[in-house]
């Protein structure tokens, strides 16, 4: 079945520029460290991780007609992702994402230049309507415009749509369309922003999940940091999945790997609780790698990690 099935990912593609400090950062000063340029973008990262997990992943995104754009498409295609339907915008710069990480791997601040994502319009998507509607699952990220997200949700037909909120700032684009979303993967802040309910701890998650389901969301996968992941189905299934002990090197891309894991498990028909645990394994592998996308990601490696992992609670 998987040979015929494919996943369509609609979202951002950009060049990641990451600065790693060797020591604790001294602000307003030059810090010794390492600077790396790697392919990135939420949608593109999800697509690459899906390809690593053995899926046919088709990326619909936009890049500029510059060196970085061509390099991005070439590297993404070499990673196993189909990029034939990506849009090349003449005269525009390819998106870039600049992040600064401390010596523990924690991201301190980031700046993004993603104006080209506005080129992912309803008109562009409509050119690929039939292809999108034949996908096994659609994954969209909130870097694209509200108009584009609305088109996806209105035209998905019977294809489930998984949405990555990206940030508290951008997730509001889908607040009024939760009933059209199959699976949403917010973190604590994004869930608070959408629901208007404070998440002070584990005791509040059921209330937040109930709010999402009352507004029509089918499945909620809520990342609660050190408390683990809370998952909830509109049918009533819910539970906690404990955090996996991980040697954190780079937090960039961990959420993208998790979304890829969830989508991959949907393609394979895996039960919800097992899907969440597998997705956590994908995230753990991303966290433990210096690159945004761990090249060692595979179904076998994730299963091995999950089966042998030490839980934190």
Where are these regions (language model features)?
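Glycine-rich phosphate/adenosyl-contacting loop at the front of the ribokinase-like
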Residues: 1-74, 78-81, 247-248, 313
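Conserved phosphate-binding/catalytic region of the ribokinase-like
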Residues: 2-9, 31, 170-171, 175, ...
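A glycine-rich helix N-cap at a beta->alpha junction
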Residues: 78-91
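Conserved phosphate-binding/catalytic loop of the ribokinase/pfkB sugar-kinase fold
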Residues: 88-89, 99-137
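Short beta-strand scaffold segments in enzyme catalytic cores
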Residues: 96-100, 109, 228-232
